[in-house]
């Protein structure tokens, strides 16, 4: 329950923070970078402890909650503000997410998250549960790369020059992977604590990896 709540909060928070552009040294990016990688860390923890089936349900729950938030924000943005209210423009900048960007974001999230979970699950089986750090980093690279390759062309194609797209994708994936590596010691401790506390360490033997099969098997 705790991880489900935290996962959904991270996704919704990232959605809001994505509306701000920030600079870290020479690199420009969206502020969603601050929190979005946490969702991949939670994905790794849940998949490592409870398996792909539970992670699959978590991803769809996060998608549903994020979709609800974006939809309610769009409706509120569509309703005219009171005549005395001066925050209409600022509110629109946050909640007036263009359908193209919203659609690209949702598709990229689902594909990236499931790629991350699939790699994590399959590598746990092949390694007999060893090398968690390597599996966590590699699954993050796979998930984040998928997310970025889908999102940026669909959301920003034609808005920014196509020749800049590869460097933008590489920068995003690199920074998010570095984020994962920096917090990896914390992730390892969280996984160990959760396994011991819940007495769970699921291996996905015989797992059906159909993303639309909403059960634990």
Identify the residue ranges that each predicted region occupies:
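Short, highly charged, low-complexity non-transmembrane loops/tails of multi-pass membrane proteins
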Residues: 191-217
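Interfacial helix-loop-helix junctions of multi-pass membrane proteins
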Residues: 153-163
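Pore-lining and gate-forming transmembrane alpha-helices of multi-pass membrane transport proteins
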Residues: 139, 167-180
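Hydrophobic transmembrane alpha-helices
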Residues: 1-63, 67
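Membrane-interface interhelical connector segments
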Residues: 75-100
């Amino acid at each position: 329950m705790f991880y489900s709540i935290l996962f959904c909060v991270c996704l919704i928070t990232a959605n809001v923070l994505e509306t701000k552009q920030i600079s870290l040294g020479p690199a420009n990016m969206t502020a969603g970078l601050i929190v979005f990688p946490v969702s991949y860390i939670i994905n790794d923890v849940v998949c490592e402890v409870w398996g792909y089936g539970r992670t699959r349900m978590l991803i769809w729950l996060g998608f549903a909650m994020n979709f609800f938030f974006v939809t309610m924000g769009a409706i509120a943005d569509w309703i005219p503000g009171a005549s005395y209210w001066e925050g209409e423009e600022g509110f629109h900048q946050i909640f007036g997410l263009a359908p193209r960007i919203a659609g690209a974001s949702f598709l990229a999230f689902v594909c990236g998250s499931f790629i991350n979970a699939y790699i994590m699950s399959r590598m746990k089986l092949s390694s007999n549960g060893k090398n968690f750090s390597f599996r966590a980093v590699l699954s993050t690279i796979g998930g984040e790369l998928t997310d970025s390759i889908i999102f940026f062309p669909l959301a920003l194609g034609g808005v920014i020059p196509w020749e800049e797209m590869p460097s933008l994708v590489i920068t995003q994936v690199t920074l998010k992977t570095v984020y994962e590596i920096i917090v990896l010691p914390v992730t390892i401790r969280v996984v160990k604590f959760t396994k011991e506390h819940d007495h769970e360490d699921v291996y996905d033997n015989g797992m059906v990896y159909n993303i639309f099969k909403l059960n634990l098997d």
